[in-house]
């Protein structure tokens, strides 16, 4: 009896030890499973790119690989691949193209307003008729108009080239080395030309006298608005060119003619699609 009791006790202990090992093993498996599952979920989460939450305009997988929304007005639209570093071999940098778009947009906004302003002011009788000319009659090649400025139009043209060339040269220097214009002597105006570190947005008392964009959020909104208006202005200037070639009059006169007789003065009738 004693022997049987000893065997039974040993058997019970062995069974208990085996059960304990099974329970511990299951807990380890469950723990490892949880760890493995967590690691898989973590590595499968895609990184969040800057500007990811944005509207996309005919964006492709390739364009989104280099247009990440960090630039103002970037909606992934690049059907020709102009900003693609792989397509150009790194010759054209997306930021350089964006910088060029901003500069050309600013010129276009000035040009769109300046091309139509003399017509409007002339019609209102605020400037002499000899200066209220359509934009295409004020160029130096060929000379046209009967305005009387302090110098002839050829002299004005050469002077404009010299001044614009100087300004563009300094602008390019600031792009190559941001802030460098604030270190070069320029008639005591260096402090106002130091820039903000972003060549496209120099800021300061000369380029931002009203202090727009004091915080990051408002500055981002203003950058986007500027790009949109610049793009619209570039299209407007293109429209001025086409209108001038087709109708032979300025854009303001085109508008007046259309308002006076919309049926006979519109895009279709001007292009003879009737």
Please identify what each model-predicted range represents.
Residues 2-274:
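Alpha-helical transmembrane segments and their helix-helix packing motifs
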């Amino acid at each position: 009896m004693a022997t049987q009791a000893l065997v039974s006790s040993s058997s019970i202990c062995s069974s208990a030890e085996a059960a304990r090992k099974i329970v511990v093993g299951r807990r380890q498996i469950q723990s490892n499973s949880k760890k493995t599952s967590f690691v898989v979920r973590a590595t499968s989460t895609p990184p969040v790119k800057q500007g990811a939450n944005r509207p996309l305009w005919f964006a492709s997988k390739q364009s989104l690989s280099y247009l990440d929304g960090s630039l103002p007005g970037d909606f992934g639209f690049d059907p020709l691949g102009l900003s693609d570093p792989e397509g150009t071999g790194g010759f054209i940098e997306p930021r350089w193209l964006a910088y060029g778009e901003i500069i050309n947009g600013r010129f276009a906004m000035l040009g769109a307003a300046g091309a139509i302003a003399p017509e409007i002011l002339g019609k209102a009788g605020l400037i002499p008729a000899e200066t209220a000319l359509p934009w295409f009659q004020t160029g130096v090649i060929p000379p046209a108009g009967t305005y009387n400025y302090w110098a002839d139009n050829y002299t004005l043209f050469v002077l404009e080239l010299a001044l614009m060339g100087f300004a563009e040269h300094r602008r390019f220097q600031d792009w190559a080395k941001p802030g460098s214009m604030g270190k070069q002597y320029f008639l005591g105006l260096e402090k106002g030309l130091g820039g903000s570190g972003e060549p496209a947005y120099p800021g300061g008392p000369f380029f931002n006298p009203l202090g727009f964009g004091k915080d990051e959020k408002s500055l981002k909104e203003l950058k986007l608005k500027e790009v949109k208006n610049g793009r619209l202005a570039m299209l407007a200037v293109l429209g001025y060119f086409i209108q001038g070639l087709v109708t032979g009059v300025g854009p303001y006169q085109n508008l007046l003619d259309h308002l006076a007789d919309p049926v006979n003065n519109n895009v279709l009738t001007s292009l003879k699609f009737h």
